[in-house]
Amino acid sequence: MATTKPYRVLLYYMYTTIENPEEFAAEHLEFCNSLELKGRILVAKEGINGTCSGTVEQTEKYMEAMNNDPRFDGIVFKIDEADGHAFKKMHVRPRPELVTLRLEDDINPHEITGKYLEPKDFYEAMKQEDTVIIDARNDYEFDLGHFKGAIKPDIESFRELPDWIRENKEVLEGKKILTYCTGGIRCEKFSGWLVREGYEDVSQLHGGIVTYGKDPEVQGELWDGQCYVFDERIAVPVNQKEHVIVGKDHFTGEPCERYVNCANPECNKKILCSEENEAKYLRACSHECRVSPRNRYVIQHELTEEQVAAALEKIEAGK
């Protein structure tokens, strides 16, 4: 691929057997540090799920080493160019599972999963009338961007998705089901779970939103907004043909694609808001969070009690 920027961000996963995740994680961290990569990699007995950043040379060495390991034969790396690192540190952590579903009877995607649809086929399937499109991500990811007509499950974490489906099964009955997520890993299990639940026509977007946005044929069409990513970039573009902002400012409802975390560390909720509203509302999602003694915005900007009181008065006056 033609390279114009000095850094890359790699996104990848693979369901494969790793006998001793703890030992592998420790050795892999050492290896990543030796290459000076930064990122977050999860390791489980069922495989690996990672995203990391480094220079072109560093990421090439990493991909070469992974491809030379028979456990990761056929692994696919999704590559984004970047101006610098997308992470502050390097973490490699063992986990009970790669994506947290916590099912009593776990899903093995090698044994049961939905049909894979390449971007063009997924694009065509979305336009069919008897199709229902389910976003398998969290609510804050959906709020920043999603496929036109996609259903937003009212969930804050992936493990809540099966219960939501059971409670809303009338939406899916008799329909062709399409599922999608950022890179594909969540849908491998989620679509498999749907098949096991008895849904007959279940498909998943192969390679996820990231692959869809890079596909030269579809060019991200039918996607509105941006794609939430779990690194310092926060959002990446998908639709190369038109950019429609779907995110709404938490405070005013105006179009917005800027995420911040609520300044109250006990809340830490992700909220969309402009720089102006961040300052006006002390980066807090509610009055309770604004007056929290641990409000990070207040501490960071060394605001006095008088300044905080004035800000609260201004908010009250504007209601």
From Swiss-Prot:
Functionally, this protein is described as follows: Catalyzes oxygen-dependent 5-hydroxyuridine (ho5U) modification at position 34 in tRNAs.
- GO biological process per UniProt: tRNA modification
User: Protein name, please?
Assistant: tRNA uridine(34) hydroxylase
Catalytic site positions: 181
Kindly state which reaction or reactions the protein catalyses.
uridine(34) in tRNA + AH2 + O2 = 5-hydroxyuridine(34) in tRNA + A + H2O
Source organism lineage?
Answer: Bacteria, Bacillati, Bacillota, Bacilli, Bacillales
Question: What's the EC number here?
Answer: 1.14.-.-
Please give the PROSITE patterns that the UniProt record associates with this protein: RHODANESE_3
Under the heading SUPFAM superfamilies, the entry gives:
Rhodanese/Cell cycle control phosphatase
Q: Which gene encodes it?
A: trhO
Source species of the chain: Bacillus anthracis
Q: Which residues form the Rhodanese domain?
A: 127-221
